[in-house]
């Protein structure tokens, strides 16, 4: 590519061609050594692996988005049969953080979030590499859904 500045890398070419038509959906995955599973799978388990957090912006402010994992989606980008390139995306339900009756409360030690209302329903996707794993516990001091 140094000899020919107009040449495009194999990776960029594969991405520009778009993903393959087949998409793989999974109930769980392991990203950077961290195990994630969809929230529907946790109904039958004692462990919790669906809590996710990612950094983003809302109304021109940087915030942390908190949610639960709904789907693990693996897209394949192949420009030839020898190379298998995949991108893993998470579809999440993001908890609404606006308003006085719902939102996020931070006491300096723990963050408490109201879990009965969602937002960004039309923008639910993040790259799996952007996710940070978090755990949710019921906060009895604020009542139901906190």
Show which residues each predicted segment covers.
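Terminal interaction-prone segments of large eukaryotic proteins
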Residues: 1-146
